[in-house]
């Protein structure tokens, strides 16, 4: 665990969506850990990207039956995400909606830091207009510097406990030699 987190104490997960449509990071992923999440989105064709965060009910309502790829699972320590596709409808112009609490735009890529203060929330990734996205890479990163030290402390504690257990087992093996009364020490050693 210490090696996986590294001194930065961060866990990073990535997926590339090949399906056209928006990408949704629901509350059970976005708000899974009580530390801010850093979201980076890169679009292969260099087109416009919009990241937007809204209360989950509002985000679900605006996406309705649109084509959406939803992050459905996070795999640690593999660092991957699963996507589940749903809907077939066209996307509304999400940029004009007044439901978004946080937004970030970019050409080819965009980044957003999502705090956990207003959970449950949903993150939506789109082109910013009605154009469907495809070949988009989403990277989610949670970072907490304390995680590294907590993992290091647990690893050290585990090593100390293992050393004590090994020592106890070794001493128990040596002291279980039967001592026969009346035999000299040298005979016991040969027997």
Positions of predicted regions on the chain:
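Extracytoplasmic/periplasmic regions of membrane proteins
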Residues: 5-141
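Juxtamembrane interface at the cytosolic side of transmembrane helices
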Residues: 142-191
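Glycine-centered flexibility motif
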Residues: 1, 119, 156-158
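Hydrophobic secretory-pathway targeting helix
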Residues: 1-7, 161-162
